[in-house]
Amino acid sequence: MFLATFKLCAGSSYRHMRNMKGLRHQAVLAIGQELNWRALGDSSPGWMGQVRRRSSLLGSQLEATLYSDQELSYIQQGEVAMQKALGILNNQEGWKKESQQENGDEVLSKMVPDVGKVFRLEVVVDQPMDRLYEELVDRMEAMGEWNPNVKEIKVLQRIGKDTVITHELAAAAAGNLVGPRDFVSVRCTKRRGSTCVLAGMATHFGEMPEQSGVIRAEHGPTCMVLHPLAGSPSKTKLTWLLSIDLKGWLPKTIINQVLSQTQIEFANHLRKRLEASPASEAQC
């Protein structure tokens, strides 16, 4: 009896030790799910409520792949960025209109504690959601071909199917008053129901140090939300939350002008790209 009990305990201990890494991943997942439910709450309106009800965005399903500690950290950073960005969008109070175009595109802004001034672009694009996803995610590195505000985007590392580390080199703006900037960011992509969320924020990547002659700026929690326009599923409602610390000394009036104009120009260039470039088999 004693020998049988000993073998049972020893076998259980061996299996426990062998599965410790998997258990750690499960713990990360469980904590993420709990944080996300608390952050988003039960009173989320519209598409935000749909995202929350379908599944926890922060508690994503980690693949069977065993990630390193650094990779797990990047995954968590991306999901935290998504949580924070969606939390900002979910708060409807305090938004002020920066600009509105004749086609209905508008930019709003507000001050967010511990983040600073954020900008919110609201547009409707006459293309299905999967087409936008293809251009903004699958063809991310080609953005410099159609968006003159971006010189280059390069994927530095892919982690699973949802997370990437990127380096972005932005062009000078405002008649060279704002010199070239670059960004190193972690980006996370999720779909829940008919809504796609693309989120990100600044991170550190040892293999991409600061570049000579370029100021290393930082994205705060930022995201794009894509979902079919109500009543017109062939069109897409795009909401872009932009939060950036450009670094260096710049007047606030210049910063506000550059960021709001950047969003308007992005929408215009995106439409032209979608009209000119054929779609492939893409699905968000």
Curated annotation (Swiss-Prot):
Q: What keywords appear on the UniProt entry?
A: Lipid transport, Lipid-binding, Mitochondrion, Phosphoprotein, Steroidogenesis, Transit peptide, Transport
Q: Where in the cell is it found?
A: Mitochondrion
Modified residue Phosphoserine is at which positions?
A: S56, S194
Which molecular function terms from Gene Ontology are attached?
Answer: cholesterol binding; cholesterol transfer activity
Any one Pfam family match given in the protein's UniProt record, by short name: START
Q: Which Gene3D superfamilies match?
A: 3.30.530.20
* One cellular component (GO) term of this entry: mitochondrial crista
Q: According to its UniProt record, in which tissues is this protein expressed?
A: Expressed within glia and neurons in discrete regions of the brain.
- Pathway membership, UniProt: Steroid metabolism; cholesterol metabolism
Describe its partners and assembly state: May interact with TSPO.
PANTHER family in UniProt: STEROIDOGENIC ACUTE REGULATORY PROTEIN, MITOCHONDRIAL
What this protein is reported to do is described as: Plays a key role in steroid hormone synthesis by enhancing the metabolism of cholesterol into pregnenolone. Transporter that binds to and transport cholesterol through the intermembrane space of the mitochondrion.
Q: What is this protein called?
A: Steroidogenic acute regulatory protein, mitochondrial
Q: Which gene encodes it?
A: Star
